[in-house]
Amino acid sequence: MSKLDLNALNELPKVDRILALAETNAQLEKLDAEGRVAWALDNLPGEYVLSSSFGIQAAVSLHLVNQIRPDIPVILTDTGYLFPETYRFIDELTDKLKLNLKVYRATESAAWQEARYGKLWEQGVEGIEKYNDINKVEPMNRALKELNAQTWFAGLRREQSGSRANLPVLAIQRGVFKVLPIIDWDNRTIYQYLQKNGLKYHPLWDEGYLSVGDTHTTRKWEPGMAEEETRFFGLKRECGLHEG
């Protein structure tokens, strides 16, 4: 696999970019997660960043990438509405893994947003999308720009939802390379990695949560529910960071 030219690829239409990366992705599918990270660091341009929501299985990608690339900037977009357990989990993992944490937030505080727009998450899909744009998408775009990122690692997995089922290991999103090292891992592999490396699930895992985001749009799993139905009232799966 040869090195890729980000600028040249960004000039192509989206379909052509996908085709241009197809051969590389076919080879990346054959590598393990560590191999994919190592390949990306050798062949894709820096600066490198890793994003994390510090959700249920976040310790896996945080540990895996940070072991290979210590001090990689870890981007967290903090909405101000995370669970108390999440904030404590962030502190715990940051200390345990010696993370180079970079926290980005909306330019408007949570209270100011509610005063201006009301509770956007109660205003259907359009309200949720506006909320996500303000609290997730804009802060992430700002983070990528300020950190001069050209290669972005994330911990998405195909098993998590229908919207992620066909994602490749390597893509271009927001003008940068996006690498998903554990995209093909199942829940069993996640569990084994956590056990092997002395890592924990998010504290709310033990209380019945399969996915954790904001307090107002996250529900416990109940029999018959798909994982994606536990977020955003089942109206949508993605928070906006991994769309487009």
UniProtKB/Swiss-Prot annotation:
Where can this protein be found? Cytoplasm
Reactions catalysed, semicolon-separated, are:
[thioredoxin]-disulfide + sulfite + adenosine 3',5'-bisphosphate + 2 H(+) = [thioredoxin]-dithiol + 3'-phosphoadenylyl sulfate
Report if keyword Transport is assigned.
no
| A Gene Ontology molecular function term of the record | phosphoadenylyl-sulfate reductase (thioredoxin) activity
Q: Which GO terms describe its biological process?
A: hydrogen sulfide biosynthetic process; sulfate assimilation, phosphoadenylyl sulfate reduction by phosphoadenylyl-sulfate reductase (thioredoxin)
The record's GO CC annotations read: cytoplasm
Specify the pathway.
Sulfur metabolism; hydrogen sulfide biosynthesis; sulfite from sulfate: step 3/3
Which UniProt keyword terms apply here?
A: Cytoplasm, Oxidoreductase
* Pfam families cross-referenced by the UniProt entry: PAPS_reduct
Please name the top-level EC class of this enzyme: oxidoreductase
Described purpose of this protein according to its UniProt entry: Catalyzes the formation of sulfite from phosphoadenosine 5'-phosphosulfate (PAPS) using thioredoxin as an electron donor.
UniProt lists the family membership as follows:
Belongs to the PAPS reductase family. CysH subfamily.
Q: What is the protein name stated in its UniProt record?
A: Phosphoadenosine 5'-phosphosulfate reductase
Q: Which organism is it from?
A: Escherichia coli O157:H7
Q: Which gene encodes it?
A: cysH
